[in-house]
Amino acid sequence: MKYHNKLSFSFTILLLNSFFLTTLAQIKPTNAKERLSSLQKRKSEAKNSLLKNIAFRNIGPTQMNGRVVDIEVNPYDPTEFYAAYASGGLWHTTNNGLSFDPIFEQEDAFTIGDIAVNWKPNSTNQSRIIWVGTGEVNSSRSSYSGTGVFKSVDNGKNWEYLGLPESHHIGEIILHPTNENIAWVAVLGHLYSPNKERGVYKTINGGKSWTQTLAIDQNTGAVEMDINLQNPDELYACTWYRTRSAWDFTPTGKTSGIYKSADGGNHWQLITEKGSGFPTGDSVGRIGIAVFQKNPQILYAVVDNNSSLRDTSTKKIDTTKYTTADFKNISKEELLTLNNAKLDSFLTDNDFPNKYNSKKIKASIESNELKPSSIYDWLVAEDGFQNNGIKGCEIYRSDDAGKSWKKVNTKPIRVFSSYGYYFGKIYVSPTDENKVISFGTSIIVSKDGGKTFTAVDKDNTHGDWHSCWINPNKDSHWIAGNDGGCNITYDNGKKWFKVTSVPAGQFYGITTDNAKPYNVYGGLQDNGTWVGSSQTASENMGFSFAKKNKETEPEEFEWKSIGGGDGMQVQVDTRDNKTIYSGSQFGFYSRKNLDNDKYLSIHPMHDLGETKLRYNWQTPILLSRHNQDVFYYGSNKIHRSLNKAENLQTLSDDLTKGKKTGTVPYGTITSICESPLKFGLLYIGTDDGNIQVSKDGGYNWTLVNKGLPENLWVSKVAASSHKEGRVLVTLNGYRYDNFSAWIYMSEDYGTTWKQIGTDLPLEPLNVVKEDPLIENILYVGSDNGLYTSFDLGKSFMNMDNHLPRVPIHDLVIQQRENELVVGTHGRSIFITKLDAVHKIYNSVANKEKTNLSK
């Protein structure tokens, strides 16, 4: 009988897995033809939109202005340069960064991987040629896909589309030094799906046509290239194997390597084979390369080596303390004999809840209530890419143009942490073969050919570096880009100043308070949580000072930091407009008061012996508007506090489809909302496609995703403020390279669903917002813009003719001022008055009434 039950259970699991895989297979990547056609339709419809003249104001911030992925500097006048932002477009300065102009913000792609400029002596910026490769290659959660290559011959006033639509992510554009019609492009390819359009592409007619000259396989593309300027037929290309899904990321593979061409990129040969001195095999990750142009025989390469790091040092072991490893395979008998004082110290050092001490744990293990492995299991994460026992960043040098390689760094370089896939760049001085710059979380410089490195990121800089230009005439002068924007040094990194005039913040979530004037709060990618006045003027978006009497009051910035890390969601208690709930990645939140130092850490944990909780990168939180003492928090379960996030209680079981094996936390709650009409009417959405409703404050939940597309990321659940049973959801296929716009509405608490917005372009949706005053008006933010419906979702129109093309991650309506606040992931915060929208709506509604009465 037991054997029969086991077979039945196994068969059931097999059927469920088959169903799951079949459903997943139905979520197919959107092909380029459909995508480009949709973009053209979008442009056409935007011209006729009733809302085409709606104006917006940008309020910043600028001091933390987003991820810069590439910089191109005029070698004849270094005060002029271009800065390419991951999702904020291309910007141009002629005054060393004091001010910038956006020159790539209305094209069919907003995200940039690399740029190249055909600089000419004595040329004006109106005559030079600029190339833009769209689609960031850093392969993070928000590395959006592009649509190919663009070119401008008039400094960005007009752009010509050059093709490569399935490239998605472009790592490098190399221009021939003397023939402006020849260029090479390193195409990394799709991030979330296999595809053939990867490798190296070459054009000999200025981009009118392309030839794929290096192709490896459907998961391996080219991420980096360099050229011998003395002999332009000699090129190098770095290939990189990487695959990603919503629950897993593999950033290494045996097809990662360096290729060389001796005939202008027409044919290629692998120069990092086994025996070359360069790492090979499944542990090789992202690679960067640099040619020393004064002597092109000298090459440098940086590699993310994921091979295990063997610790051969003779470190003195601290026997006065326990380590995590001590508990890995510990027996019951061994644990019960541990020193209580040392065990208590270990529990304190590792942030175990206060309710656990040595005596209580030993008693629970002795009674078999807990397993001996419970301590180790509680500490070690099942998910996440947290393997620090790898070699990581390594520097290699070749003195024979790639025939052989030698590792030159004598000590481990700790700049990659666990995410070397996010970096992979190396530079060599144009004049000094031994001066090498590379980076990861820090920017590092070597003066001895890569043997030793020194971190030189000082005050006024930001972490996570991605690009650097070295002045060919003065190699102590660098212009570098990182997750916080651009930094400039004139003394090899001893002192830096920060470029702070670009509103390119990458917001995840935003909210407002009810102060007068009201403030806007938001969490930014790798830039923490900030608050700024909704009345911030364009000239005061960054390090411009607030209007104060400077003789009697200290200077203040218009935007202020209220939290670090990757800023996520924010909630404000509008009873005082001072109590703030904010946090960072994977659910580490806090409650703080802006007027004092009162602070409460918020991060619910599982108990010893329980299955670990799972937290989304952007873990959702919610403050009830019915009673702002009530606070909700979503892991894979719902947690609630009745007293301002203190004493959080777990109310639900796992509301997702369950844990899925992989290196990325998955099976997590992504959205929480409460009905504005009924206290305790809650909805949640998950990253694996579940939508659940509770009508009793979170104690009991019902799955209500019948009839919806399966397994899609639920980006937003929004309960209606007009009808109690109405709820709206947006589903997002970005993590399948599917760009469909999915939005659904239910009138019966999710029992049945109806798809709306079927005329929306092929752009993944992030947020839907009801207009609180007019029931028929809906606002939707996508990965490419803002749309509005006047008929409860039957049809939508563009509302972003005066916005740049940029992902819109969040929308908030400040009801007192009747303003729509737009949180973008690349161009900071925009605000518009809704009075004009309402006026247009009423005009349309009155015309329809008149026509009906005739």
Residue spans of the language-model regions?
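Beta-propeller blade termini and top-face loops
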Residues: 26-850
